[in-house]
């Protein structure tokens, strides 16, 4: 047992050491990635954004603001035009999809709910109001009369068991029982 415990401790110590080394490597990799992203961001901004030259006088600053507002207006107009084009193309796509469904005969059907209909109403709906078809499904069935069996007659004669108990309960019921026995 002592040797086994030492071996287990050595294995856990080795695992702990490997985990800490892996965490250190991961931390350095994250730092490198962060610095790389920062440098890429700076490069992109330096390429795409011209450096800002602020002139000394107020009139030059106002002129710069007017130029920037003009650029903003142009960008907004382009954005609006593109949005209109996108809306127009999406509308055309919907129309074409609808035409395609119409040509194929596949319509989007609304969810149907169950309606109880008689056979006559169903035939009238299918054939239209011009055709008068009466479909009485019970007309061709055989008429069967129920024959009373002896058991059923006995059950009917006995009647409700509650009435029998009520009649026998109390003094009058007991009196009748004695009178009927003698």
Swiss-Prot record:
Keyword Acetylation belongs to the record: yes
The entry's keywords: Acetylation, Actin-binding, Muscle protein, Phosphoprotein
Record's GO cellular component terms: nucleus; troponin complex
Keyword check for Phosphoprotein: yes
Where does the record place the modification Phosphoserine?
Answer: 118
Question: Which SUPFAM superfamilies does this one have?
Answer: Troponin coil-coiled subunits
Question: Compositional bias of type Basic and acidic residues: which residue ranges?
Answer: 29-45
Ranges for region Involved in binding TNC: 2-48
> Which region ranges are annotated with the description Disordered?
29-53
Q: List Phosphothreonine occurrences by residue.
A: 12
Pfam families per UniProt: Troponin
Q: Which InterPro entries match?
A: Troponin, Troponin_I, Troponin_sf
Q: Where are the transmembrane segments?
A: none
Role noted for this protein: Troponin I is the inhibitory subunit of troponin, the thin filament regulatory complex which confers calcium-sensitivity to striated muscle actomyosin ATPase activity.
Task: Give the protein's recorded name.
Answer: Troponin I, fast skeletal muscle
Q: What is the lineage of its organism?
A: Eukaryota, Metazoa, Chordata, Craniata, Vertebrata
């Amino acid at each position: 047992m002592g040797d086994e415990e030492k071996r287990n401790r050595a294995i856990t110590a080795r695992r702990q050491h490997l985990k800490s080394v892996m965490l250190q490597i991961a931390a350095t990799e994250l730092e490198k990635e962060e610095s790389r992203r920062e440098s890429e961001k700076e490069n992109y901004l330096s390429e795409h954004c011209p450096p800002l030259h602020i002139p000394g006088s107020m009139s030059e600053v106002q002129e710069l603001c007017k130029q920037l507002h003009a650029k903003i207006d142009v960008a907004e107009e382009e954005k609006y035009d593109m949005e209109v084009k996108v809306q127009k193309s999406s509308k055309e796509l919907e129309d074409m999809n609808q035409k395609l469904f119409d040509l194929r005969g596949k319509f989007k059907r609304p969810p149907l709910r169950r309606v109880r209909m008689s056979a006559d109403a169903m035939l009238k709906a299918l054939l239209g109001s011009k055709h008068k078809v009466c479909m009485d499904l019970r007309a061709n069935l055989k008429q069967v009369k129920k024959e009373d069996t002896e058991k059923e007659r006995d059950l009917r004669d006995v009647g409700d068991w509650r009435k029998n108990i009520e009649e026998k309960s109390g003094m009058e019921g007991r009196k009748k029982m004695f009178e009927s026995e003698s």
